[in-house]
Design a protein with these regions (language model features):
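Short acidic, glycine/serine/threonine-rich loops at helix termini
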Residues: 1, 17-20, 46-49
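Short, well-ordered alpha-helical segments in soluble proteins
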Residues: 12-13, 26-27, 87
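Long, compositionally biased charged/polar accessory segments in the mid-to-C-terminal portions
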Residues: 29-199
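Short, solvent-exposed amphipathic alpha-helical segments in soluble enzyme
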Residues: 1, 22-25, 132-136
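A short alpha->loop->secondary-structure connector
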Residues: 1-8
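Short, charged, surface-exposed secondary-structure boundary motifs
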Residues: 13-22, 106
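Short, flexible loop/turn elements at secondary-structure junctions
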Residues: 9-12, 100
């Protein structure tokens, strides 16, 4: 009776091998203690060595090749494409994750992020009530969460880009395979970077 189960909404997990291959070898030699995908509420990909952010490896997520591949779903593990937990039927007392697709709300600073909490059982309701005094919460339509969170409906779908990357990777390696799988995305990323730094 004292056990509560909580599950995360997972959009997919790339292999650690891809992360290592995306980081320059001279940086990998450093004593990396932490990796941040958000820093001070900003969407930046940062590597941290001995509590100091490495200035040579901190960039907006929109300008990072590893994150570009992740957001386009081409570096997920094969098991992510057939995940038994990505469905409407939930297995835990409570489900938590980012609230993508949130519409009108009383929250004034939505850019700091809003969490989604799904209460699936009576035990989940008990757990939520135990925490409610420390939270600001709004009851939302269940469909609002379903519409913008693909893993709440089904596993992430395999794309043509995914097939291109997986076919080329054994022969050309990580970065070259991404260039072939994401030529338009990478070109747009480079143009944006050039324009920003050559005003």
């Amino acid at each position: 009776p004292n056990l509560f189960t909580v599950e995360l909404i997972c959009h997919g997990v790339p292999s650690c091998k891809f992360l290592k291959e995306s980081i320059p070898s001279n940086i990998l030699k450093k004593r990396i203690k932490q990796i941040n995908f958000r820093s001070n509420s900003q969407y930046k990909f940062s590597l941290i060595e001995d509590n100091q952010i490495l200035p040579s490896y901190q960039r907006p997520l929109s300008n990072d090749l590893y994150m570009k591949a992740f957001f386009n779903g081409i570096t997920y593990r094969p098991s992510c494409l057939s995940c038994h937990f990505a469905r409407k039927e939930r297995n835990a007392d409570m489900t938590i994750g980012d609230f993508w697709g949130l519409k009108s709300t009383k929250i004034t600073d939505i850019n700091k992020g809003v969490s989604l909490v799904l209460i699936n059982t009576n035990a989940g309701k008990t757990l939520f009530n135990l925490c409610s005094d420390s939270l600001y919460s709004e009851e939302r339509p269940y469909k609002e969460a379903l519409d913008a969170n693909e893993p709440l409906n089904h596993p992430i779908k395999k794309s043509i880009r995914y097939n291109v990357f997986r076919t080329l990777y054994p022969h050309f390696g990580y970065k070259y395979s991404l260039f072939f799988a994401l030529p338009d995305k990478i070109l747009a990323m480079k143009i944006k970077y050039y324009l920003k730094h050559n005003k």
